[in-house]
Protein backbone atom coordinates (compact mmCIF):
# COMPACT_ATOMS: atom_id res chain seq x y z
CA UNK A 1 0.00 0.00 0.00
CA UNK A 2 1.08 3.58 -0.52
CA UNK A 3 0.50 6.66 1.61
CA UNK A 4 0.44 10.25 0.34
CA UNK A 5 1.64 12.99 2.68
CA UNK A 6 0.25 16.28 1.38
CA UNK A 7 2.68 19.19 1.66
CA UNK A 8 1.26 22.71 1.83
CA UNK A 9 3.34 25.90 2.05
CA UNK A 10 3.95 26.11 5.80
CA UNK A 11 3.51 22.40 6.61
CA UNK A 12 6.07 21.31 9.19
CA UNK A 13 4.93 17.85 10.28
CA UNK A 14 5.10 16.29 6.83
CA UNK A 15 8.51 14.76 7.56
CA UNK A 16 7.20 13.31 10.83
CA UNK A 17 4.32 11.66 8.96
CA UNK A 18 6.64 10.37 6.24
CA UNK A 19 8.97 8.60 8.64
CA UNK A 20 6.16 7.32 10.86
CA UNK A 21 4.82 5.50 7.80
CA UNK A 22 8.20 4.48 6.35
CA UNK A 23 9.92 3.38 9.56
CA UNK A 24 7.02 2.82 11.94
CA UNK A 25 4.76 0.92 9.55
CA UNK A 26 7.19 -0.20 6.87
CA UNK A 27 4.81 0.97 4.14
CA UNK A 28 5.32 2.97 0.97
CA UNK A 29 4.96 6.74 1.26
CA UNK A 30 5.50 9.81 -0.90
CA UNK A 31 5.36 13.56 -0.38
CA UNK A 32 2.72 15.20 -2.57
CA UNK A 33 2.88 18.94 -3.26
CA UNK A 34 -0.36 20.86 -2.78
CA UNK A 35 -0.62 21.68 -6.49
CA UNK A 36 -1.23 18.02 -7.38
CA UNK A 37 -4.66 17.33 -8.88
CA UNK A 38 -4.70 13.53 -8.96
CA UNK A 39 -4.30 11.25 -5.92
CA UNK A 40 -5.74 8.11 -7.46
CA UNK A 41 -2.51 6.09 -7.13
CA UNK A 42 -2.47 6.45 -3.34
CA UNK A 43 -4.31 4.26 -0.87
CA UNK A 44 -4.20 6.54 2.18
CA UNK A 45 -3.98 10.33 2.30
CA UNK A 46 -2.41 12.19 5.22
CA UNK A 47 -2.84 15.92 5.81
CA UNK A 48 -0.07 16.83 8.27
CA UNK A 49 0.29 19.45 10.94
CA UNK A 50 1.98 22.81 10.60
CA UNK A 51 0.94 26.32 9.67
CA UNK A 52 -0.33 26.07 6.09
CA UNK A 53 -0.11 29.48 4.42
CA UNK A 54 1.01 30.88 7.78
CA UNK A 55 -2.47 30.32 9.24
CA UNK A 56 -3.47 33.66 7.72
CA UNK A 57 -7.17 34.48 8.06
CA UNK A 58 -7.45 31.38 10.29
CA UNK A 59 -5.92 27.93 10.41
CA UNK A 60 -6.64 25.99 7.23
CA UNK A 61 -8.76 28.71 5.64
CA UNK A 62 -6.48 29.24 2.63
CA UNK A 63 -5.19 25.68 2.30
CA UNK A 64 -8.73 24.46 1.64
CA UNK A 65 -8.50 26.20 -1.77
CA UNK A 66 -5.29 24.41 -2.81
CA UNK A 67 -5.76 22.32 -6.00
CA UNK A 68 -5.02 19.11 -4.12
CA UNK A 69 -8.09 19.52 -1.93
CA UNK A 70 -10.45 18.78 -4.80
CA UNK A 71 -8.54 15.54 -5.32
CA UNK A 72 -8.77 14.83 -1.58
CA UNK A 73 -12.53 15.33 -1.79
CA UNK A 74 -12.78 12.96 -4.76
CA UNK A 75 -10.82 10.23 -2.99
CA UNK A 76 -12.89 10.70 0.17
CA UNK A 77 -16.04 10.12 -1.87
CA UNK A 78 -14.49 6.88 -3.17
CA UNK A 79 -14.04 5.70 0.41
CA UNK A 80 -10.26 6.02 0.71
CA UNK A 81 -8.84 6.53 4.19
CA UNK A 82 -7.94 10.14 4.92
CA UNK A 83 -6.42 11.37 8.16
CA UNK A 84 -5.92 15.03 9.01
CA UNK A 85 -3.65 15.72 11.96
CA UNK A 86 -3.62 19.09 13.76
CA UNK A 87 -3.48 21.62 10.89
CA UNK A 88 -4.71 18.80 8.67
CA UNK A 89 -7.81 18.52 10.88
CA UNK A 90 -8.31 22.27 10.60
CA UNK A 91 -8.08 22.04 6.80
CA UNK A 92 -10.63 19.21 6.67
CA UNK A 93 -13.15 21.24 8.67
CA UNK A 94 -12.58 24.33 6.52
CA UNK A 95 -13.10 22.20 3.41
CA UNK A 96 -16.37 20.82 4.79
CA UNK A 97 -15.11 17.24 4.86
CA UNK A 98 -15.60 17.16 8.62
CA UNK A 99 -18.11 19.02 10.82
CA UNK A 100 -17.19 21.76 13.24
CA UNK A 101 -14.42 24.32 13.52
CA UNK A 102 -11.14 24.72 15.38
CA UNK A 103 -10.90 27.97 17.33
CA UNK A 104 -8.12 29.57 19.35
CA UNK A 105 -7.34 27.72 22.56
CA UNK A 106 -9.37 28.83 25.54
CA UNK A 107 -6.31 30.29 27.28
CA UNK A 108 -5.09 31.94 24.04
CA UNK A 109 -1.73 30.19 24.40
CA UNK A 110 0.08 27.63 22.26
CA UNK A 111 0.06 24.25 24.02
CA UNK A 112 2.86 21.75 23.43
CA UNK A 113 2.93 18.66 25.64
CA UNK A 114 1.96 15.00 25.84
CA UNK A 115 -1.60 14.44 27.05
CA UNK A 116 -3.96 11.59 27.86
CA UNK A 117 -6.52 10.76 25.18
CA UNK A 118 -9.60 8.58 25.72
CA UNK A 119 -10.86 6.37 22.89
CA UNK A 120 -14.59 6.92 22.33
CA UNK A 121 -15.12 4.82 19.20
CA UNK A 122 -13.14 1.65 18.51
CA UNK A 123 -15.20 0.68 15.46
CA UNK A 124 -13.49 2.98 12.94
CA UNK A 125 -10.75 1.93 10.50
CA UNK A 126 -8.40 4.12 12.54
CA UNK A 127 -9.07 2.61 15.96
CA UNK A 128 -9.49 -1.16 15.62
CA UNK A 129 -6.26 -1.77 17.53
CA UNK A 130 -7.79 0.13 20.44
CA UNK A 131 -10.66 -0.45 22.87
CA UNK A 132 -13.43 1.95 23.78
CA UNK A 133 -12.45 3.71 27.00
CA UNK A 134 -8.75 2.97 26.53
CA UNK A 135 -6.38 5.75 27.54
CA UNK A 136 -3.40 6.53 25.33
CA UNK A 137 -0.68 9.17 25.43
CA UNK A 138 -0.14 11.45 22.43
CA UNK A 139 1.67 14.76 21.91
CA UNK A 140 -0.26 17.92 21.09
CA UNK A 141 1.13 21.16 19.68
CA UNK A 142 -1.44 23.75 18.71
CA UNK A 143 -2.72 27.25 19.28
CA UNK A 144 -6.08 26.71 17.55
CA UNK A 145 -7.29 23.33 18.76
CA UNK A 146 -10.46 24.40 20.52
CA UNK A 147 -13.03 22.24 18.71
CA UNK A 148 -16.48 23.78 18.38
CA UNK A 149 -19.83 22.58 17.06
CA UNK A 150 -23.32 23.87 17.78
CA UNK A 151 -25.73 21.85 19.91
CA UNK A 152 -27.54 20.36 16.92
CA UNK A 153 -24.33 19.13 15.32
CA UNK A 154 -23.05 17.82 18.64
CA UNK A 155 -26.22 15.76 19.00
CA UNK A 156 -25.68 14.36 15.50
CA UNK A 157 -22.05 13.51 16.25
CA UNK A 158 -23.11 11.59 19.33
CA UNK A 159 -25.99 9.86 17.56
CA UNK A 160 -23.75 8.76 14.68
CA UNK A 161 -20.87 7.75 16.96
CA UNK A 162 -18.60 10.22 15.17
CA UNK A 163 -16.67 11.33 18.25
CA UNK A 164 -13.51 9.21 18.12
CA UNK A 165 -11.23 10.76 20.74
CA UNK A 166 -11.62 12.99 23.79
CA UNK A 167 -9.02 14.64 25.97
CA UNK A 168 -9.01 13.16 29.45
CA UNK A 169 -8.89 16.70 30.83
CA UNK A 170 -10.03 20.05 29.48
CA UNK A 171 -6.89 21.00 27.56
CA UNK A 172 -8.02 23.81 25.26
CA UNK A 173 -11.73 24.45 25.77
CA UNK A 174 -12.98 22.00 23.14
CA UNK A 175 -16.69 21.17 23.34
CA UNK A 176 -17.00 18.11 25.59
CA UNK A 177 -13.19 17.72 25.39
CA UNK A 178 -13.41 16.44 21.81
CA UNK A 179 -9.98 15.68 20.33
CA UNK A 180 -10.95 13.88 17.13
CA UNK A 181 -13.99 13.18 14.94
CA UNK A 182 -14.81 11.13 11.87
CA UNK A 183 -17.19 11.68 8.96
CA UNK A 184 -20.49 9.81 8.66
CA UNK A 185 -19.07 7.46 6.05
CA UNK A 186 -16.29 6.49 8.45
CA UNK A 187 -13.25 7.02 6.22
CA UNK A 188 -12.14 10.58 7.05
CA UNK A 189 -10.63 11.23 10.49
CA UNK A 190 -9.50 14.53 11.92
CA UNK A 191 -7.63 14.79 15.20
CA UNK A 192 -5.54 17.42 16.98
CA UNK A 193 -3.12 15.03 18.78
CA UNK A 194 -0.11 13.76 16.81
CA UNK A 195 0.09 9.96 16.41
CA UNK A 196 3.03 10.38 14.02
CA UNK A 197 5.09 11.74 16.92
CA UNK A 198 4.53 8.59 18.96
CA UNK A 199 5.66 5.69 16.78
CA UNK A 200 9.08 4.94 18.30
CA UNK A 201 10.13 4.41 21.92
CA UNK A 202 12.90 6.97 21.36
CA UNK A 203 10.14 9.56 20.99
CA UNK A 204 8.66 8.67 24.38
CA UNK A 205 6.04 6.07 23.51
CA UNK A 206 4.53 4.13 20.62
CA UNK A 207 0.81 4.74 21.20
CA UNK A 208 0.52 6.43 17.82
CA UNK A 209 1.03 3.05 16.17
CA UNK A 210 -2.35 1.92 17.48
CA UNK A 211 -3.92 4.46 15.13
CA UNK A 212 -1.54 4.25 12.17
CA UNK A 213 -1.42 0.46 12.39
CA UNK A 214 -5.20 0.25 12.39
CA UNK A 215 -5.22 1.97 9.00
CA UNK A 216 -2.95 -0.71 7.56
CA UNK A 217 -4.98 -3.52 9.12
CA UNK A 218 -8.23 -2.24 7.66
CA UNK A 219 -6.79 -1.50 4.24
CA UNK A 220 -5.69 -5.12 4.06
CA UNK A 221 -9.20 -6.19 5.12
CA UNK A 222 -10.73 -4.17 2.33
CA UNK A 223 -11.66 -0.74 3.68
CA UNK A 224 -14.58 0.77 5.56
Swiss-Prot record:
Protein's name in the database: Phosphoribosylformylglycinamidine synthase subunit PurQ
EC number: 6.3.5.3, 3.5.1.2
Record's subcellular location: Cytoplasm
All residue ranges annotated as the Glutamine amidotransferase type-1 domain in the record: 2-224
GO terms under cellular component: cytoplasm
SUPFAM superfamilies named among the record's database cross-references: Class I glutamine amidotransferase-like
SMART domains per record: GATase_5
UniProt xrefs under CDD domains: GATase1_FGAR_AT
Organism for this UniProt entry: Caldanaerobacter subterraneus subsp. tengcongensis (strain DSM 15242 / JCM 11007 / NBRC 100824 / MB4) (Thermoanaerobacter tengcongensis)
Source organism superkingdom: Bacteria
UniProt-annotated catalytic positions: 86, 194, 196
Enzymatic reactions: N(2)-formyl-N(1)-(5-phospho-beta-D-ribosyl)glycinamide + L-glutamine + ATP + H2O = 2-formamido-N(1)-(5-O-phospho-beta-D-ribosyl)acetamidine + L-glutamate + ADP + phosphate + H(+); L-glutamine + H2O = L-glutamate + NH4(+)
Higher taxonomy: Bacteria, Bacillati, Bacillota, Clostridia, Thermoanaerobacterales
Record note on quaternary structure: Part of the FGAM synthase complex composed of 1 PurL, 1 PurQ and 2 PurS subunits.
NCBIfam families the record matches: FGAM_synth_I, PRK03619.1
